[in-house]
Regions:
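Secondary-structure transition/capping residues
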Residues: 8, 25-28, 56, 149, ...
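Low-complexity, Gly/Pro-rich coil/beta segments used as flexible assembly/activation regions
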Residues: 56-91, 126, 133-167, 198, ...
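Short linear sequence signals and composition-biased patches located at protein termini or domain-edge surfaces
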Residues: 135, 142-231
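Extracytoplasmic beta-strand-rich oligomerization domains located immediately C-terminal to a leader/signal peptide
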Residues: 13, 17-127
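N-terminal single-pass transmembrane signal-anchor helix
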Residues: 1-17
Length: 231
């Protein structure tokens, strides 16, 4: 009887150790998967922001809009690469409006989703109802903008200049639960993105006629100064 009892204790100890290893491995895999999803979501946001486009003459089409809070979103027009998520759906239509939004998930919690629509086209029903899910179990999605017009320049969480691109955007994404701190997100990422473009003004977007070939009659009106030839 004593031997059987000792054997039972040994088996129980082995099982407990094995279960702890399996549970730790599962937790580690879940954490790694969550971190990878967060990196993919952040990279998608960065790629879209660095491809943003804006033309002042078409401000109604190229507006830049954002909102923070429980229904946070970020929407703008970008010229996207072929490797951008879901680009295959749109063929050669690489100039599209992208909207990143924080929405309730079907099961519970919230998720960060991406919708796209080619410029000058309405949103498709499929894109509206079945957006690309970039991240699940999102606790927070916030966006801030560098306001160069403020005195002094500073960060703001409200971008009211919808017909102008911000020069610098900071976004943060928090996901999951920290098992050691109840109520705290398990993963958080912060990125600073410098937009490599500015809003194109009408005079640049639609320049006037050039000087034409040599000997051609010049258009009426003041002419630009010509460089002096060699003396």
């Amino acid at each position: 009887m004593v031997a059987l009892a000792l054997l039972g204790l040994i088996v129980a100890a082995i099982y407990s150790s094995w279960y702890a290893i399996v549970r730790g491995s599962r937790t580690g895999l879940q954490a790694a998967a969550a971190a990878q999803r967060m990196r993919v979501a952040a990279r998608t946001l960065e790629e879209a922001l660095t491809s943003a486009r804006s033309y002042a003459a078409n401000a109604k089409l190229y507006y830049f809009a954002a909102e923070n809070g429980d229904k946070a979103y970020l929407s703008f027009v970008a010229r996207l690469s072929k490797s951008f998520p879901r680009s295959g759906r749109f063929g050669e239509l690489d100039v599209r409006r992208v909207t990143f939004s924080l929405e309730p998930a079907p099961d519970s919690g919230k998720q960060l989703v991406l919708r796209q629509s080619p410029l000058l086209m309405d949103w498709s029903q499929d894109e509206q109802e079945h957006p690309a899910v970039l991240a699940r179990d999102v606790k927070e999605f916030t966006v801030q903008f560098w306001d160069a017009h403020a005195t002094p320049p500073d960060w703001t969480d409200e971008w009211t200049q919808t017909n102008e691109l911000p020069s610098l955007v900071m976004f943060s994404l928090a996901m999951g639960e920290d098992p050691s701190h109840l109520g705290r997100a398990g993963h958080m990422i912060v990125r600073f993105v410098a937009l490599p473009t500015v809003t194109v003004q009408p005079g640049v977007q639609a320049p006037g006629p050039g000087p034409g070939p040599p000997g051609a009659p010049r258009p009426p009106g003041p002419q630009p100064a010509q460089p002096a030839g060699p003396s």
